Amino acid sequence: MEKRLGVKPSPASWVLPGYCWQTSVKLPRSLYLLYSFFCFSVLWLSTDADESRCQQGKTLYGAGLRTEGENHLRLLAGSLPFHACRAACCRDSACHALWWLEGMCFQADCSKPQSCQPFRTDSSNSMLIIFQKSQTTDDLGLLPEDDEPHLLRLGWGRTSWRRQSLLGAPLTLSVPSSHHQSLLRDRQKRDLSVVPTHGAMQHSKVNHSEEAGALSPTSAEVRKTITVAGSFTSNHTTQTPEWPKNVSIHPEPSEHSSPVSGTPQVKSTEHSPTDAPLPVAPSYSYATPTPQASSQSTSAPHPVVKELVVSAGKSVQITLPKNEVQLNAFVLPEAEPGETYTYDWQLITHPTDYSGEVERKHSQSLQLSKLTPGLYEFKVTVDGQNAHGEGYVNVTVKPEPRKNRPPVAVVSPQFQEISLPTTSTIIDGSQSTDDDKIVQYHWEELKGPLREEKISEDTAILKLSKLVPGNYTFSLTVVDSDGATNSTTASLTVNKAVDYPPVANAGPNQVITLPQNSITLFGNQSTDDHGITSYEWSLSPSSKGKVVEMQGVRTPALQLSAMQEGDYTYQLTVTDTAGQQATAQVTVIVQPENNKPPQADAGPDKELTLPVDSTTLDGSKSTDDQRVVSYLWEQSRGPDGVQLENANSSVATVTGLQVGTYVFTLTVKDERNLQSQSSVNVIVKEEINKPPVAKIAGNVVVTLPTSTAELDGSRSSDDKGIVSYLWTRDETSPAAGEVLNHSDHHPVLFLSNLVEGTYTFHLKVTDAKGESDTDRTTVEVKPDPRKSNLVEIILDVNVSQLTERLKGMLIRQIGVLLGVLDSDIIVQKIQPYTEQSTKMLFFVQNDPPHQLFKGHEVAAMLKSELQKQKADFLIFRALEISTVTCQLNCSDHGHCDSFTKRCVCDPFWMENFIKVQLRDGDSNCEWSVLYVIIASFVIVVALGILSWTTICCCKRQKGKPKRKSRYKILDATDQESLELKPTSRAGSKQKGPTLSSSLMHSESELDSDDAIFTWPDREKGKLLYGQNGSVPNGQTPLKSRSAREEIL
């Protein structure tokens, strides 16, 4: 149960004040001050205000907290910042965990075993902090850090949290499956049945701190769940010595128990001002130790609740149209003979709009049917005789996969016919449809007249040109995203040029009224496909004998005059280039005269103020059915001495006016001498002029990127009216900024392209008498608060080609790269960068609470993601990505140029071009020029030494001489001569055979077969000329050789 309250003091601060003040009244005055000092000291020590004992333990992001029982979860009243919420929890001894959920602060009392359980939430703004206040995690009733199977049951080990882009790395708690199984086996082997001894259950004296709620269970109590059965009345409160005085025990209602009996539960008697609901979350139940009902029950042994290991199986995943599944619960240990377990299935998590049917909710197997797509989480509770356990399982229902339907090729028009000189047309195939999308169009000309090349295109709309007469048949084949195809045909007929006869048009019938007796007829609306060569007007035979004068009878316009009352019919004949003719007739009706008197109009009354003493009288708006032939202006009333100029015209001028009222009468006449009169009043007043008053609405404050402003001076006033406005800019104002539509001469001044700074403008108003007045106002332009977080991207596209639809696609692609929603990317400005590129400024924020992401992090992440993706991931190639304001630190050896967005290094420093080219591409000033010169010199010297060494080794290798081999291939003749030679004497060496190779020529080949040179001659160094030349190639003592060696 939750409570909403302020910062809660410690229980000791409630008990000690009453004790101190009641006791101090009984003391003598001499000891009153000493006793009061002692009480204040004890009170200060009991407030737990020392936050040094408050050590923060684990912090879980995206997690919430649920508690068992009542008064364990409290919501602090009011809106507190995070640091105030944490400080309040540190000061409160009953606060062991802090749950911060979207600006709301919840404190949890986890002093009882297993009273606080974390769970995963879908909110990214949820954070759970566990404090260590001189107690271990087990003592506080929270999960120990090694109890990771419970975290797996909450879904933190199987589901990766949503990636928090730009704000931090994702938090994922995972446990290997082998470790999970070992923990389950260890828990199964535990002996959970422990019966406390009589001495341990004896009542002990409770001091003030114990009465304040400082009853912390031991770690053994956390691991062993003990329930105490008892019978209590629903309206009776039993005070026990084991619990504080402000805690009462009431029976907990159960659906299987009567209102007068049940299991007692502890409920605090403290009252909170208001109650506030908590976020809805799944309910996890754990058995907790309960206090003894009475001191007499401590001597009897308590039943022990065994913990059951319950498994609902692995998560189930089905795909529609299959919408049924059966969940089975498995329990260890199995029920004893004669004992059965009760099962209770509960739906914890489900989709927003879901439906389905559940059967056998209280059996071991749960049957689900008619499920809708989404994620369902079920909890099964198993109870037996003094045994309890829970299990969880997820069921995921996926929507039915889409079945592809082949596309439908549609051409429009399917049949088309044109005639020369029209030689081009189009056939539209873009109306072809598919259940997903069409990825390819292919047009093929199946039949047509003989031409140079047939038509074959891959576009949705086929554009045809330079057609020749004949019949064409075109085939359209469409391919959808799944590779299915469909085809259709379109027919086109091109006819030869046809010369159609002309179409004569003499115009509509005309009606005139005497005395008008002339009119012009027009036949230029006549048409022909190749042009008209002649026009001829004539009087119709039905109008022969009527008097009329005709001019231009062989032109498109016929002029008629001297017509009399009656009907005239005229005939127009037109001839084209082929000599074909067409005729048309038109009738002119001449009506008799019907004259009406004219209508005089002298115009509106006028009011003048001296020194203006003249005005004009306008009667030009007078009308007549025929025409007005005369005007006459006369003074009917008023002071004498005025002069009328042009009194016989429609517009007259009156001069010499004095103060007073004048009445002037206008008389008009028509041709039949019919007349009409009208009067106009002219009032002349004395001059009383007041200077004008200039007034501007007020100062204007503009915050960039809004760069327009409006200054309203229309509240300026004058008794006669303001004739001119003039806005001027003060000399101290920034020169940037433009005036729109010459509004500096109008009451309202419109400004654009303002820059940061303060503008001062002066308004000068002038009346008809030349008197003027001025007013002053300021326009303060504040800098853009998002300027440091703005990111600019240069796109390779003309700004006129970037449509709103393409802009939306680009924003969605950038959102995918950054891992944010489309609505989180706010485009501030799109403007041309060059003739073929466009610059787009945007920033990224999360929704809510609209926290801006850092611009340099957004730019860096966008660059990194684009390097990982393909070059054409974005619909337009990104030429450059950077922040609007240059935020490079230049390695603290230079400054950043705001125009080029690159570092300008200090003297003796230069850019690390290797890092720029191979890594992040950001400009820097990391290298010292001196070190670069030294390193370059060392590299050049090392390369020179290496090159010299390589050349020397190569020359030495080439200088070693190579001994040429001297061999001769034995033939049959040589072998026979070797066999016929006599054997040498003992001790003498065998004579060498005759050699005749290209390298060693013997003179024996030229003389005779008896001349034989022996090897001893060679051993003595007497080589014959002609064998190896005159230059010796080296001599070495010869060893005794065999016959074959001597031959070789």
Curated annotation (Swiss-Prot):
Residues 231-241, 985-994, 1027-1039 have a biased composition (Polar residues). It holds the Pfam family KIAA0319. Residues 198-218, 231-300, 593-623, 980-1007, 1024-1048 are annotated as: Disordered. It is found in: Cytoplasmic granule membrane; Golgi apparatus membrane; Golgi apparatus, trans-Golgi network membrane; Cell membrane. Glycans are attached at residues 246, 394. Residues 49-127 form the MANSC domain. The modification Phosphothreonine is found at residues 973, 1036. This is Dyslexia-associated protein KIAA0319-like protein. It comes from Mus musculus.
